[in-house]
């Protein structure tokens, strides 16, 4: 049997790669197989919207597309086992996706992760200079479902918090809320790193502004 020529294109997405590994039969599809065409269509739709890994509305939606072409719902069953409903909710309806002008003095930007590892997270906070309260939060993330869900939940968590309180948030809080499995704990760690990096960036701007005056 031939090997699916589109398989290498899935490598940037660890989530999709996991699904494909789970369904080893995909690698045996030939170009003549109708499912091969459906997989190609999925890959063409696998794009980023607003920086969040959203194809067919989200990477989760795209993975659902793979599930739809699996035999007897095999992929869908795998997906249900891998992702908690809370992850799916944040993944299909990510909160606060977007960006802010990083040059503004009251906006802190945290960029963490590495493309080579498959997960890159950017989280931005808008802070009230007088009260130190986070008034707005935005994120853009490229990564698996757990990475996007962790980012989305983090934005909800820190909105309205003071910088001091936000800096105390641990990845375990996120992991517990989303019921992340051990293999996905690094996603919650990225979210913790992102908020700390954003706070650090904001504070460094404040220091620079104070020095200039």
Curated annotation (Swiss-Prot):
Domain of life: Eukaryota
Lineage: Eukaryota, Fungi, Dikarya, Ascomycota, Saccharomycotina
Keyword terms: 2Fe-2S, Iron, Iron-sulfur, Metal-binding, Mitochondrion, Transit peptide
Subunit: Component of the core Fe-S cluster (ISC) assembly machinery.
GO biological process: intracellular iron ion homeostasis; iron-sulfur cluster assembly; tRNA wobble uridine modification
GO MF terms, alphabetically ordered: 2 iron, 2 sulfur cluster binding; ATPase activator activity; ferrous iron binding; zinc ion binding
Pfam families assigned: NifU_N
Cofactor detail note: Binds 1 [2Fe-2S] cluster per subunit.
CDD domains to which the protein is assigned, alphabetical: IscU_like
Function, as annotated: Scaffold protein for the de novo synthesis of iron-sulfur (Fe-S) clusters within mitochondria, which is required for maturation of both mitochondrial and cytoplasmic [2Fe-2S] and [4Fe-4S] proteins. First, a [2Fe-2S] cluster is transiently assembled on the scaffold protein ISU1. In a second step, the cluster is released from ISU1, transferred to a glutaredoxin, followed by the formation of mitochondrial [2Fe-2S] proteins, the synthesis of [4Fe-4S] clusters and their target-specific insertion into the recipient apoproteins.
Cofactors, names only: [2Fe-2S] cluster
Pathway listed: Cofactor biosynthesis; iron-sulfur cluster biosynthesis
Signal peptide: none
Protein's cellular compartments: Mitochondrion matrix
Protein name per UniProt: Iron sulfur cluster assembly protein 1, mitochondrial
Main location: mitochondrion
Record flagged with keyword Mitochondrion: yes
CC per GO annotation: mitochondrial matrix
Family: Belongs to the NifU family.
């Amino acid at each position: 049997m031939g090997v699916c020529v589109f398989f290498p294109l899935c490598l940037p997405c660890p989530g999709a790669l996991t699904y494909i590994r789970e369904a080893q039969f995909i690698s045996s599809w030939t170009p003549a197989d109708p499912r091969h065409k459906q997989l190609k269509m999925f890959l063409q739709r696998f794009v980023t919207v607003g920086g969040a890994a959203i194809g067919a509305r989200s990477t989760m939606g795209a993975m659902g597309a793979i599930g739809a072409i699996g035999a007897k719902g095999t992929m869908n069953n795998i997906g249900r086992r891998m992702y908690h409903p809370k992850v799916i909710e944040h993944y299909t309806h990510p909160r606060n996706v977007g960006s802010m002008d990083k040059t503004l003095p009251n906006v802190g930007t945290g960029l963490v992760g590495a493309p080579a590892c498959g997960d890159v997270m950017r989280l931005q906070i808008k802070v009230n200079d007088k009260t130190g309260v986070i008034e707005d939060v935005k994120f853009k993330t490229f990564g698996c479902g757990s990475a996007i869900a962790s980012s989305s939940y983090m934005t909800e968590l820190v909105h309205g918090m003071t910088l001091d309180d936000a800096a105390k948030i641990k990845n375990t809080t996120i992991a517990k809320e989303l019921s992340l499995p051990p293999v996905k704990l690094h996603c919650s760690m990225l979210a913790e790193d992102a908020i700390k990096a954003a706070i650090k960036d904001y504070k460094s701007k404040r220091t620079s502004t104070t020095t200039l005056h």
